[in-house]
From Swiss-Prot:
Residues 254-273 are annotated as: Disordered. Its main location: cytoplasm. It comes from Xenopus laevis (African clawed frog). This is Exocyst complex component 8. CDD domains: PH_RalBD_exo84 (cd01226). The gene is exoc8.
Amino acid sequence: MAEGGGSVQRLRRQLESNSFQAEQYVKLLSQQSDGDRDLQEHRQRIQSLADETAQSLKRNVYQNYRQFIETAKEISYLEGEMYQLSHILTEQKSIMESVTQALLYTDRSEAARELQTAFPKEAEEGKVRNLTTLLEKVEGCKNLLETPGRYLVYNGDLTEFDVDNMALIQKVHAFLMNDCLLIATSVPNRRGIYKYNALHNLDDLAVVNVKENPPMKDMFKILMFPESRIFQAENAKIKKEWLEILEQTKKNKALNEKQKQEETTPQLPVVPEIPANPFIDEDGTFDEVEVDLTIDWIQELPEDLDVCIAQRNFEGAVDLLDKLNSYLEDKPLTHPVKELKSKVDERVRQLTDVLVFELSPDRSLRGGPKATRRAVSQLVRLGQSTKACELFLKNQAAAVQTAIRQLRIEGATLLYIHKLCNVFFTSLLETAKEFEMDFAENHGCYSAFIVWSRLALKMFVDAFSKQVFDSKESLSTVAECVKVAKEHCKQLSEIGLDLTFILHTLLVKDIKAALQSYKDIVIEATKHRNSEEMWRRMNLMTPEVLGKLREEMRNCGINNFDQYTGDDCWVNISYTIVAFTKQTMAFLEEALKLYFPELHMVLLECLMEIILVAIQHVDYSLRCEQESEKKAFIRQNASFLYENVLVVVEKRFEEGVGKPAKQLQELRNSSRLVRVNPESTTSVV
């Protein structure tokens, strides 16, 4: 024994060696072995070592399983927090970049205006000189300099793409002048030299931002009826500069043309001043009432809003907006008020975008419905109730879907269904309560919640059906699972939400299929027993077995079974009829757990088909049997079937459904009239 243990240890060390080579080991083993017996012994040693290793591995897994689960949970939580932190940092970075770019652009614009004011002639000459220098590098555009007052505003390299299929067309260089946009293409083998491509008047074009769709990003579209062109900038910063400068240049051109038109308009003769009407109030209704916007908090309002948005102080930002709206509520809409409102509206758009991002499903979903309350409440205060409702429900749909996907399918189906129902209906209940709290004053949003609840319930039923019906579970398991789902669904009625009818509608197809499938199994089993029918009494051998059968019959609802039992553990009923009774009543009990009105006719038809198989078999046997003794025994079985089994089926069906089944009564009453050809050797089913 010690020698065997030592050989196993040597074998273990040999296999654990870093220099172990399987092919060399097998070759050497086959050379050294004396025969088949040595190889069998060596195989046993390897097998015992493998079993020992497997047991050791299993013990280690069990010992560290709890620690592994806890570690996995911590990693999952940490991943969610890091993901949320990454989004916050990205958002902060974009806000800081936008603020920096706005400040730089403002500084550059002010410096340029100051320089132009101080040296107007030199500035004009400098612009023309720059335009001349650049256009000397473009072939075919000498006539552009003939237009007086034209100067260069901005220029840079762009990449043009096809509008239809986003295919790369060419590299271009764009020159933006104060009244037009010149597009030039690169000349091959001549660095820095361009060729004229197109010239667009600023009045005839419109600039449109193109939504980011990686890898196609940093793009903008220029519309020139009836065509359009798409260009890509080197980065987001340059794209933003192009969009802003193009829009500003178009505005400046329109403003200059308007000023020139006003200057050329002849002056109207001066109308002598009409004496004041002494009956009009001296204050006059013709003077514009001035609104005091010099208050410190109003002057600092745009900057304060920027700070609140950057610091994610959404409540503070909305409080400032409410304060401003209250102050301006009874004030006239003067020009300074319009300017202030335009500045504030831009901040409102930024705040709305941030709140919308907070409610996006990409955010961490671990907080549940309450985690969205802050963003939802502020969107509602901003008058965005519809958008808040839509985003809240999308967020919760993603959260519910994620929770369902994270459920592990292990163990019995019923255990999984308990977990699934608990997760889904608890989430639905919490969502409903949070929705009622967030949108208490917005009754128009409730219809959206009902629609969302139906879609969420369909998602639940898909997961439920996949596990319960697609896996071909027994009817008893199906009944228990459906019962659990119904009980959880009824809990929603405490908040006035009854989805039971929708649950029935979504499940009715699968339950019908399950009932018909199990009905076929019962019929097939009954036919198989009928084919082996010998019409003999049952001898149960021991009183214990007989007592067990009596208990089973009482559970089936047959209370007078004792009159069919004899001495010495004999039962005066055929095994086929007894088995049919137990199987039919078991089917009926499980089917009644699944019952709802839409299944009434399906259940009734299934029962009638099952009963008809037994009735026709008894009727056929009674007519074909020649021995008087067996014939009397068959009549006794027929009496038990008609007067006990069918009566109990009718009674139990009426108790479970709430109304009698006339079809079952008619079947029992008319079954004695069934006639079968005595010369036939097969049952009519």
